[in-house]
Amino acid sequence: MSIITDVYAREVLDSRGNPTLEVEVYTESGAFGRGMVPSGASTGEHEAVELRDGDKSRYLGLGTQKAVDNVNNIIAKAIIGYDVRDQQAIDRAMIALDGTPNKGKLGANAILGVSIAVARAAADYLEVPLYTYLGGFNTKVLPTPMMNIINGGSHSDAPIAFQEFMIMPVGAPTFKEGLRWGAEVFHALKKILKERGLVTAVGDEGGFAPKFEGTEDGVETILKAIEAAGYEAGENGIMIGFDCASSEFYDKERKVYDYTKFEGEGAAVRTSAEQVDYLEELVNKYPIITIEDGMDENDWDGWKVLTERLGKRVQLVGDDFFVTNTEYLARGIKENAANSILIKVNQIGTLTETFEAIEMAKEAGYTAVVSHRSGETEDSTIADIAVATNAGQIKTGSLSRTDRIAKYNQLLRIEDQLGEVAQYKGIKSFYNLKK
């Protein structure tokens, strides 16, 4: 009864109006699962391949019909007949079927859509929530959210090099309260921006994209919004985080961090050592708890220096640096580079490999942050993954745009379902820092 009988993919649109895949899986019993695949704007060069058609006459070359066909004509034939509950065997079969190290033949987007749909169909068959199916009955930790309330870099037209300015309600007693704190700061920030005559349009991830005078101006404005909303900045209230997305402004030939790419003429151009110094200055000046991709994805020496200098005080997250890949993570652990990994399911392409990366991180004392992509859908799978793995942190955008709110609302439902056993760790989510 739990045998897969049908697999079907179609092309749908993501939050940026670009095509992506939606996959449906059916079993003999009538159990059903659906998965939708996100897409990134700033992508690591080592990520699994997102297969696009390249036909400029259709969706500007971004169509996903090839990936859809790969699901319907190749993957479906290979996995029909499998027990839907055997996630690992199905994921491994798809990896073998593709046969490339980066899933470039079938496309990571094709494989991931099936992987998610299989998990959802299995949960439906067993009549349990997805987070319970994936993590077992002892899953009870709600993640502390990283809320991206100001967008810069590749996610907006704002003249700021850093891609994301985030707030984290680390002092909140519950997820529900933490979400409220974040929403109230978001609205306080909007009011402040309006009063300054700055634009309140939002970027890809729902954060504002105003023309600030620089990084410090962005942070100072967030601190004012926290105060205006009635909260305190710091460990008992709300802390700040950055996604520098440094690979987006790193000049490989000159080996410098060229802020002029986003901030224009007159902006800083920093060496690797100067980039570390600058980040340390910001940490000394502001209540910063997390920095993502502070160094370029290939600047291993820079990462090691940054970790040596700040690794006990601040969460240093590898996104483009690790691309949710256990091979790169293992090297980072060995060389003491970074102390946290960002988990993006479409960077690696299957749920099995995603869970392996989280497990490896935890065993090494690294934290794991489950994350969305800038091109999202209404699919809320990552909310369930965050709870299923007891990851403790989730990064899923701002407090606007339904593609972001869908994940927060799912977490509210899960907290409700868990009732009194639900836990929200807040500042304790950063278990590898000296707090």
UniProtKB/Swiss-Prot annotation:
EC?
Answer: 4.2.1.11
Q: Where is this site: Important for binding of plasminogen?
A: K428, K434, K435
Tell me the compartments it is located in.
Cytoplasm; Secreted; Cell surface; Secreted, Cell wall
This entry's comment on the bound cofactor is:
Binds a second Mg(2+) ion via substrate during catalysis.
What are the catalytic residues?
Answer: E205, K344
Outcome reported for the amino acid change (mutating K434L): No effect on catalytic activity; significant decrease in the ability to bind Glu- and Lys-plasminogen
Q: Which GO terms describe its biological process?
A: glycolytic process
UniProt binding sites for Mg(2+):
D243, E292, D319
Gene Ontology cellular component list: cell surface; extracellular region; peptidoglycan-based cell wall; phosphopyruvate hydratase complex; plasma membrane
Q: Which InterPro entries match?
A: Enolase, Enolase-like_C_sf, Enolase-like_N, Enolase_C, Enolase_CS, Enolase_N
Q: What is the effect of changing K312A?
A: 62% enzmye activity, about 200% increased plasminogen binding, about 1.75-fold better tPA-dependent plasminogen activation
Give residues annotated as binding (2R)-2-phosphoglycerate.
Q163, K344, R373, S374, K395
Q: How does it assemble?
A: Homooctamer, a tetramer of homodimers.
Q: Report the function annotation for this chain.
A: Catalyzes the reversible conversion of 2-phosphoglycerate (2-PG) into phosphoenolpyruvate (PEP). It is essential for the degradation of carbohydrates via glycolysis. 'Moonlights' as a plasminogen receptor. Binds plasminogen and more weakly plasmin when expressed on the bacterial cell surface; probably has more than one plasmin(ogen) binding site, may bind via Lys residues. Plasminogen binding potentially allows the bacterium to acquire surface-associated proteolytic activity, which in turn contributes to tissue invasion and virulence.
UniProt lists the family membership as follows: Belongs to the enolase family.
Name assigned to this protein: Enolase
Name its species.
Streptococcus pyogenes serotype M6 (strain ATCC BAA-946 / MGAS10394)
